[in-house]
Amino acid sequence: MHNIKVGTKNPFLSGRKRPPFEEVEAAIRTFLLWIGENPNREGLLDTPGRVAKAYRDLFTGYDESVEEILGTVFEEVSGYNEPVIMKDLSFYSHCEHHMIPIVGKAHIAYFPDEKIVGLSKIARVVNVFSRRLQTQEAMTAQIANALETHLKPRGVAVLIEAEHMCMTMRGVQKQGAKTITTSFHGSYEKDQVAQAHFMMIVRRSS
């Protein structure tokens, strides 16, 4: 599931056509029947179409390319020699096991070498990977790898904290439990002081 290369759109669809919208609506009607509902009652008549449109919006990450987002960089850092840190980047995703929401925040730092990127691009990278079926571990690694590949910084740090509705709504039903994952590259992997500085800023109250 996670063999999508950094910077590419979904290779699974290469040369393939997506099923038509009507087939998706029909599948959702079948699902409504399967759970014991009547898709012909007034409140559900338009639900299959609404659900299909909603999921089209929720999974836009399959249609976006990190390479395009990070393709424009600035090569003049004007003497800046410190990390760029963005915290509290809210996101939603869906777990690939149950297709149930994951809701959380991403905290990201990179140590520029010769390239910097607009701050909104970092947020868009998070959106690309979060708006796919995911595991939190894979998403953390994908964001870090994308920044390392395209910005070629001295170091990258990514920390994601999220609540998984598959643990909240079903199974063990532990409301409020959060999962934390990290990925450190370059100077952030080798330098414990830099890593500790990143963690301190992430944990500092706004």
Swiss-Prot record:
GO terms for biological process: one-carbon metabolic process; tetrahydrobiopterin biosynthetic process; tetrahydrofolate biosynthetic process. GO terms for molecular function: GTP binding; GTP cyclohydrolase I activity; zinc ion binding. It holds the Pfam family GTP_cyclohydroI. Zn(2+) binds at C95, H98, C166. It is an enzyme of class 3 (hydrolase). InterPro entries: GTP-CH-I_C/QueF, GTP-CH-I_N, GTP_CycHdrlase_I, GTP_CycHdrlase_I_CS, GTP_CycHdrlase_I_dom. One of its GO terms (cellular component) is cytoplasm. Pathway: Cofactor biosynthesis; 7,8-dihydroneopterin triphosphate biosynthesis; 7,8-dihydroneopterin triphosphate from GTP: step 1/1. Keywords: GTP-binding, Hydrolase, Metal-binding, Nucleotide-binding, One-carbon metabolism, Zinc. Gene3D superfamilies: 1.10.286.10, 3.30.1130.10. It catalyses: GTP + H2O = 7,8-dihydroneopterin 3'-triphosphate + formate + H(+). Its EC number is 3.5.4.16. Belongs to the GTP cyclohydrolase I family. NCBIfam families: folE, PRK09347.1-2, PRK09347.1-3. Toroid-shaped homodecamer, composed of two pentamers of five dimers. This is GTP cyclohydrolase 1. It comes from Bartonella henselae (strain ATCC 49882 / DSM 28221 / CCUG 30454 / Houston 1). The gene is folE.
